[in-house]
Design a protein with these regions (language model features):
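Catalytic cores of the polymerase beta-like nucleotidyltransferase superfamily
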Residues: 1-418
Length: 418
């Protein structure tokens, strides 16, 4: 085991809900530690989400100790040794130490154990195989601490065998590298992912979607996605052409504008050129209706936006709304190869912040006075007037609006002359 180190930057170990759970589970011959992502992120000074706990205690003992301490327990996966304890409305998954007796794909015949090293060896990557006890001492049975220091994502054990256990680990390898790694992906892991690419086809769309969405917004997404493309690993996921250049362009544009990473927007840059691509991705990744609509809108004639003048941009913004306008324009920017500091693109994309979209000022009453009654005719005249108002660049003066209304009625009457 690698020499342990003390984790000082983890106040949640000293007080709060996690510390309480550890205190309840420790003692009388049993030990509990925080494991996995929380330890990794604490060591990397990254935000910590869920805190998972492993223990030598069997599930029944976990439940009985929780009950005695007044802590709610939920047997969420008790057949696998997992009990969820809820403290101050925060859930903690507590899992009894396990070791594989026999593995076959994602399935494994496991036995509860008391060996921390055997439990750590079941995890996927070395940086996820660390544990920390209540005193803040980090225990490393798999070589994770040197990999944390090097920001290196490495499989525990033989990469090919670990991938064959669950082919989702191919996507996890790149996603974890994009989130926490540095430089090129670990060579042995990378080659094993390429060799095992055929296994991606058997994964459920829901599981693939989860990893793809997390990958899209990771800090190192550009490098990871490029490595996947070079290894032939994007085609089995997206099923069609992909565009790493525009993907990099979208990331650069988001950063230049100070925007939060958006998974769907980045996915559009990577894999959507026309609206049919959005429909294909929706099926392959089980996208929500809202996500599909966003992708579909991005792919709709985005190429018409690149050379707009300011007046045309205002009309597009009026028709599309701020979100669809920005998304579609950013796709055009990313696909144009334009520099992220290009003033013209920046001006177009930031138009919604600089210009308030006005409401169309003409109403039904304005046309009733001109002999147009409620009904289909009114709708057609209003549409003609709105088009003319946009073409005139949104005038607000009374005389201009009167002229637009008169012209719309005259055109309608001319077009519908018996």
């Amino acid at each position: 085991m690698t020499d342990a180190r003390v984790l000082d930057a983890a106040p949640w170990l000293r007080s709060g809900p996690a510390a309480r759970v550890l205190a309840v589970l420790n003692g009388d011959g049993e030990e509990a530690r925080v494991v996995g992502g929380a330890v990794r992120n604490a060591l990397l000074a990254a935000p910590i989400g869920d805190i998972d706990i492993a223990t030598t205690a069997l599930p029944d003992k976990v439940i009985s100790r929780a009950r005695a301490a007044g802590i709610k327990s939920v047997p969420t996966g008790i057949e696998h040794g997992t009990v969820t304890l809820v403290v101050e409305a925060r859930p903690f998954e507590v899992t009894t130490l396990r070791e594989d007796v026999e593995t076959f794909g994602r399935k494994a015949r496991v036995a509860f154990g008391r060996d921390w090293a055997r439990d750590a060896e079941r995890r996927d990557f070395t940086i996820n195989g660390l544990s920390v006890d209540a005193a803040g001492v980090v225990h490393d049975h798999v070589g994770g601490l040197p990999d944390i220091a090097a920001r290196r994502v490495r499989f525990i054990g033989d990469p090919a065998r670990r991938i064959a256990e669950d082919y989702l680990r191919i996507l996890r390898f790149f996603r974890i590298h994009a989130s926490y790694g540095s430089g090129e992906p670990d060579r042995a892991g990378y080659l094993a992912c390429i060799s095992g690419f055929a296994g991606l086809a058997a994964l459920s769309a829901e599981r693939v979607r989860m990893e793809v969405m997390k990958l899209m917004i990771a800090d190192g997404a550009e490098g990871a996605v490029t490595a996947m493309a070079e290894g032939g690993l994007l085609l089995p996921i997206f099923g069609s052409v992909f565009y790493t250049g525009p993907f990099a362009g979208m990331i650069a544009a988001e950063r230049a504008l100070g925007l939060e990473p958006n998974a769907i927007r980045r996915l559009g840059a990577l894999a959507v050129a026309v609206t049919e691509d959005a429909k294909r991705l929706s099926g392959r990744l089980r996208l929500t209706n809202q996500e599909t609509k966003k992708l579909d809108s991005m792919g709709h004639r985005w190429w018409r936006l690149g050379g707009m003048d300011e007046a045309t941009a205002r009309r597009r913004l009026y028709r599309l709304g701020a979100e669809r306008y920005r998304d579609r324009l950013m796709l055009a920017w990313a696909r144009s190869g334009g520099e992220p500091d290009c003033p013209r693109w920046r001006e177009l994309v930031t138009l919604p912040e600089r210009w308030s979209v006005p409401k169309f000022p003409l109403k039904a009453a304005d046309f009733a006075a001109r002999g147009i009654a409620e009904g289909p005719a009114l709708g057609q005249v209003l549409a003609l007037a709105e088009d003319a108002w946009l073409a005139a660049d949104f005038p607000a003066g009374e005389s201009a609006l009167e002229a637009i209304a008169d012209h719309a009625v005259a055109r309608f009457n001319r077009d519908h002359r018996p």
